[in-house]
Amino acid sequence: MSKKAPAQKKLPRAAAWYEIDMQKGVFRFKNKLCPKCGSVMAFHREPVPRWHCGKCGFTQFQR
């Protein structure tokens, strides 16, 4: 029997988190930061569009 190598985790690329402007040399964060605790907020579409902080539980609903 051959043993399988453990699966390696793929790390997210920086391009997924940042908008990069090569002409100006600027990196801008794509997601919002939580106004309460300062961590990164996630955008959820279902059941209603909203930004949610997983750390402190703050939720901001879209209009």
UniProtKB/Swiss-Prot annotation:
ZnF bounds (C4-type): 34-56
Gene name of the record: rps27ae
Keyword annotations of the record: Metal-binding, Ribonucleoprotein, Ribosomal protein, Zinc, Zinc-finger
Gene Ontology terms, MF aspect: structural constituent of ribosome; zinc ion binding
Organism: Pyrobaculum neutrophilum (strain DSM 2338 / JCM 9278 / NBRC 100436 / V24Sta) (Thermoproteus neutrophilus)
Pfam families, sorted: Ribosomal_S27
Protein name: Small ribosomal subunit protein eS31
Similarity remark: Belongs to the eukaryotic ribosomal protein eS31 family.
One GO term of the biological process aspect: translation
Cofactor(s) listed: Zn(2+)
